[in-house]
Amino acid sequence: IEKAGTTLENETVLGDLVIAESVGEGNVTLKNVTVLGSVIVKGGGANSVYFDGVRVGGAVRLEKEGVHLRLRGDTALERVEIGLPCRITRDSTFEGALGALVIDLAKESAKEIQIEVPAKRVELLSRTNVALNADVETLRIDRDAEGAQLDIKRGVMVGELSIDARVALTGSGLVVSLVVSVSGVTVSGSLTVEKTGTEGGAKAPTTSGGSSGGSSGGSYVPVKIVTGAAAVPDV
């Protein structure tokens, strides 16, 4: 797709689909489209790429800084890869969840990545700032994400959060189970952590601004993303 304003509807793409750089900041809409390969997004702006009833067999690769991917209807994405800061949101008709969301930036950026769609699994592989405004079953922060910040918004729940790098956890959401393998992790006092564990001799996270409500004991009940719920409002 090379032109802004393009709508692709009721089609099956046998290979990869590329939204080209020539789209610029323009709009592109995919409606009732099945892509057997991957979708590579190189064009589009802050309010421009819409997936409505889209199914992708491979990955959706977001390679344009500042692009906004908006999900609608029964869109089903098993894997989304973020290569540059962007935003992923949903409207009230989207009732699913991303299978896997992998954040691995091609270059370091101070700009925030905004995730407003539920996901079964999230992997943060590089240093960046992430605002999480939807539930996640499991989230892993890799050692290469040293210095990253994860802002878990109010009303958002992360089931299992494992951390292998010195990062900052902020926000006022809920983490059911937190496990750290390095010392130096900080947790905002407004964030609720039900259970905290350490591995490899790491020190427990330090808390600022009050109590996180955490506990080193108790049992963990896995969180399951239930589709069909209403969209989480922006905070």
Give, region by region, the residue ranges found by the protein language model:
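Ser/Thr/Gly/Pro-rich low-complexity, disordered linker/stalk segments of secreted
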Residues: L178-S181, V187-P233
